């Protein structure tokens, strides 16, 4: 990866910028733009990633840690093509289940780290190498994981 010379501080700054580039507006009740609970959007995204064979699917609860978003959804595709397919599946299934569409999707060109910004929910889909490099779980180590019953 070209970013391997970045310092820890630069990585954190990059992650914060990438995670919150499209919006920094939150509602007090953690509702999405259409009034759906942010947790429901996060769970729908996680289920969609799992359904598309995403690996290590997690939802980090940031409600007590961040003023910008409430949940991170993390998933890994085995390669660029699968990661891109996971993003498509999440976009479709979250729209069906919650009536939500992302404000923006970043990283579609490189397909190593794609980010879907739903406002109070930010979805990160990685290739294995990018997930290992950025380690968002470590950067947000204080964030509890939502228990998921992925079927």
Regions found by a protein language model. Give the residues of each.
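Mid-chain, well-packed structural core segment of small domains
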Residues: 93-122
């Amino acid at each position: 990866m070209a970013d391997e010379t970045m310092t820890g501080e630069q990585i954190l700054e990059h992650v914060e910028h990438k995670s919150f580039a499209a919006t920094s507006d939150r509602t007090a009740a953690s509702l999405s733009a259409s009034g759906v609970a942010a947790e429901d959007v996060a769970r729908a995204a996680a289920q969609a990633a799992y359904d598309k064979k995403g690996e290590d699917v997690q939802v980090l609860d940031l409600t007590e840690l961040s003023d910008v978003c409430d949940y991170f959804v993390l998933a890994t595709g085995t390669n660029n093509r699968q990661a891109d397919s996971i993003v498509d599946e999440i976009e479709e299934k979250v729209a069906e289940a919650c009536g939500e569409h992302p404000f923006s999707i970043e990283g579609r060109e490189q397909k190593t780290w794609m980010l879907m910004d739903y406002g109070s929910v930010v979805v990160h889909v990685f290739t294995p190498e990018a997930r290992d490099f950025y380690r968002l779980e470590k950067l947000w180590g204080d964030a509890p994981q939502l228990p998921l019953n992925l079927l």
